[in-house]
Amino acid sequence: MSQSICSTGLRWLWLVVVVLIIDLGSKYLILQNFALGDTVPLFPSLNLHYARNYGAAFSFLADSGGWQRWFFAGIAIGISVILAVMMYRSKATQKLNNIAYALIIGGALGNLFDRLWHGFVVDMIDFYVGDWHFATFNLADTAICVGAALIVLEGFLPSRAKKQ
């Protein structure tokens, strides 16, 4: 018996689209208005700074000759498919997990688009304290981290099934 998509976690796929629109829109604005390396202060400890990342988080494998582009693209596709299957197998009422999965998929697809279209990921958020700067990142990275944090949080919450 087939189930309605609205009764599964796939009901939350709209959030993937929202993450993609916001992420790709922010990257488009950076590409149209900034030269590589340009910085604009927003608030104390927060700048907009156009950087290119040819690797993964913290520029991991950025200087590896180009193969990493396809490696990380494959990881993004694989994770997105696995999480979409998990969403399909979960109930729409399992909000925290489905929101987390949608955020991760949206972020992964946003960075995947950059890797395939530009050959690098557009980063623009520069958080700093004094002279110390955290690695420059983007909104897709933020969505992935928030999604991962929600999965960890869900692991600490009491299960409703155990209460019944």
UniProtKB/Swiss-Prot annotation:
Role according to the record: This protein specifically catalyzes the removal of signal peptides from prolipoproteins.
The organism of origin for this protein: Escherichia coli (strain K12)
Keyword Cell inner membrane on entry: yes
Underlying gene: lspA
Reported temperature dependence: Optimum temperature is 37-45 degrees Celsius.
Major place of residence: membrane
Biological processes per GO annotation: proteolysis
Record topology, Cytoplasmic segments: 1-11, 89-95, 160-164
Protein name according to UniProt: Lipoprotein signal peptidase
